[in-house]
Amino acid sequence: MATRSNARVMWRMLGLAKPLAGWMVLAVACGVAGFCCATGVPVLAAEAALSAVEAGSLPWTLGTTVAVLAVMAVARGVLHYVEQRCNHYIAFKLLAHVRDLVFGALRRLTPAKLAGSDSGALISTVTADVELLEVFYAHTISPICIAVLMTVVMGAFLGGIHPVLAAVALASYALVGIAVPVAVSRASGGEGRRSRDLAAWLSGFVLDGLRGLGEVLQYGAGASRLEELDRRSAELVASQRKLRARGAAGQATTTGAIMVLSCAQMLLAVWLAGAGLVTAEGAVLATVATFSSFGPFVALANLGSTLQGTLAAGNRVLDILDEEPLVAEVPDSEGRHPGFDGIAAEDVSFSYAGGSSADGVSASGEKILDHASVGVEPGQIVGIQGKSGSGKSTLCRLLMRFWDVDRGRVALSGTDVREVATSALRDAEAFVEQDTHLFHDSIRDNLLIARPDATGEELEVACRAASVHDFICSLPNGYDTMVGELGDTLSGGERQRLGLARAFLHDAPLLLLDEPTSNLDSLNEAQILKSLSDQRGHRAVVLISHRPSTMAIADKTYSMDQGRVS
């Protein structure tokens, strides 16, 4: 996690609000006008009371004064509503924009940078951390601007009575609106960030436990995991309690400071009136105005505690947005579009360079491929076999350009894949891994991910080729059947056949299949192998398998051992 100052985090988040600057100006204008009404009501009432005893200078009648007070009171409510409506419109628009940016960043980082990462922490960032930014966009930006402008307004009003009164008021505003929140923030230290990190860890721990609930129950590990969950939960509660305690102390300090400073202003006004430096009317109005003007600055004072968690969340979001992908996408305008005339790995060497493989296994820089060369011609079926860990799956991922090679090159139609537009590369290839991911959606929508504009007939043809159409039709809702989270209502073989159907529907000229029949019985295997054999001449197929029966349909077979190809 990068270390950024709070000011830097705020500046970066503020930059995202530029497209909504007009709404922000409206919110600030309504906020300033609303606080002017809030302060003006007691000031005008005091002036009316003074005029009633012939100590004021109000030129209006009592009826007019009451009408003006009523208008100002109603206006205060309306203006506050509009201000908050604008602030939350800005906040929710920006939260949607930030989510879009985060998902875009995750897509760029996948899979090389996210392999083996804590999915629970990512979920926490995408959901809870992004939601916490609402505090900044709805309750921080405009209150700061409103407080600054109200300082100018009140300084001008009190300065018109006496400069010393204005100076004391400005010092009071600075103490309440700046000194108190800064002190609370410093007292909190890194507790806000620690609290967010603990929450993210707990999210990952719970997600892990739910996914592995069967193993936890089978091996009686529930007590130890529950103990760890309780321990970390207690740490999170303690951290949040500290933040709330700091916030409560800040609020108490703010309230006490306002009372002391307002009384000091009152005593000063009395002294100035006694010395003949201001009129009695001026002393009363200055006192009333000061007592009623701290609203905008109380909002700032409260940020000292509430903003800690928000800035920590913002820092975690920026970590994702600023992360550089290991494999940079090639835009359509800059990349080449060579079509498909074969693909080849030419003298390729590769290691995960101390990171993690796509399976989340630390590679510690171990060379996975060592001067490996493989060629696939259009319409050809190529088999790759070898022991587990020999680099077969890694080779497929390099052909997909999920990672870039260390030496040599991967060439699509004679063009280095690093020069091919990413969209063109994805259109040319379809990859089915051993574990097919299915979304918590219908079978139809899971398949249409590969080609959203596919017709029902094309969908059926792909499913028949994957030997899964009859199974789908046997379900109560057919293609509209929900598959459950991660496809957990289906067997491994059913998920695998749906993955194959999705690849067939994509209709790419190159199919990369990693153990496509590992979860299938002999009957379904034979049907799928026949479908794959029928692809010969229509599209190229790369098969990774341990099964001799699968390799039997290959036109050419490579053997891999310790990263070398023979």
Tell me the role of every PLM-derived stretch.
Residues 2-4, 92, 100-124, 128-130, ...:
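Short intracellular "coupling" helices and adjacent cytoplasmic loop segments at the cytosolic face
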Residues 1-38, 58-65, 83, 87, ...:
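Membrane-integrated ABC transporters
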Residues 51-61, 157-171, 246-315, 320-321:
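Helix-loop-helix
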Residues 85-104, 142-146, 169-214, 221-223, ...:
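Cytoplasmic coupling helices
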Residues 24-79, 159-164, 277-280:
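Transmembrane helix-loop-helix hairpins at lipid-water interfaces of multipass membrane proteins
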Residues 14-19, 111-112, 128-137, 141, ...:
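An intracellular "coupling" helix at the cytosolic face of ABC transporter transmembrane type-1 domains
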Residues 337-566:
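ABC-type nucleotide-binding domain
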